Amino acid sequence: MRTVKLIVCILFFAVCAFFSLGTLITGSSVITEGGIEKPRLITETGVNRNFGNEYEEYFSRAFAYRRYVVDAWSALRVNLLHEGNDQVVVGKNGYLFFADTIDAYTGLNPMTDEEIAKAADSLLALQTYANEHGAKFCFLPAPDKNTIFPENMPSRYMRAKTTDLDRLLAALDERGVTYSDPREALTAAKSEKIYYKTDTHWTPDGAELAFALTADKLGVQMFDTNTVGRVGEAIQGDLNTLLYPGQTLTESVMTADFSDSFIYTSAFSTPMDMVITSRGGGHGKALVFRDSFCNALLGLVSSTFSETQFERANPFRLDLLGTSKADYVIVEIAERNLRNLIGSDERIKEVID
């Protein structure tokens, strides 16, 4: 018995030593979550009294070969238990879902009636301000993937009969706020690849379906993607990356080739730039407030208008209407983030006050 205990102890300390000393090997430790720095016991101000907690956090994210350990653990959970991690839900037929969408899907922790009213009032204020400055307004909620593909969710999650999005759109109807609801169109097209299996977002084709409804609400002629060719596009699914940080797994789709239909006029770096401006061959100027779901719309929207300005800041900078002279205002936001609409009109309140 003592021999067994000794072997277990030796193995335990050997594993700890391997991962600890392994951090000294160049390339063995790669931090991908937030860029945390190695803490110091002695700082410019003296002894770091929080060194223990800081080093514990650092080591948990920087121990040697962490990515491969996480990959192996995820593979075991996915293949044996059909489970992901605290950020990823493993669904059916190869679908992965973002864990942050579960509350919206199940109705757990729903928005209160007061929150719904505040979100709707903010959108009404945004629309009123846009109209007063000569711009048409449309709100575009981007449905969570499990809203469109509930059949691929694990059976343990029960879908809510009435969602926050249902309630918000009803409140917008009462207030006369213009919106486009793409859920029906996306559901009807679900046999096509309109959402990525391994990513949170819709594909370019799914995004096009949603924007077609928005353009119709605004009375705009959407750019005809049939007039350009199609090219292959491979993305590294964000959900796959959260499950398997040590692997480079891609998912491919076909998308319209917008290379000759618009140009970026800002110093474009990535689709997640805080501000992006573009010039296309369409008519009118657009001001678009958006999140990551709009990444798949950059080319299409830019090609539809003569000038477009995309903004990621919230509260929304609708005060820019004073200088941009936009003809159209679009507010796009993911279904899971509807609470972020509350107070999104603060910037125009400052201008009015």
Residue spans for each PLM region:
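Extracellular glycan-modifying ectodomains
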Residues: 1-353
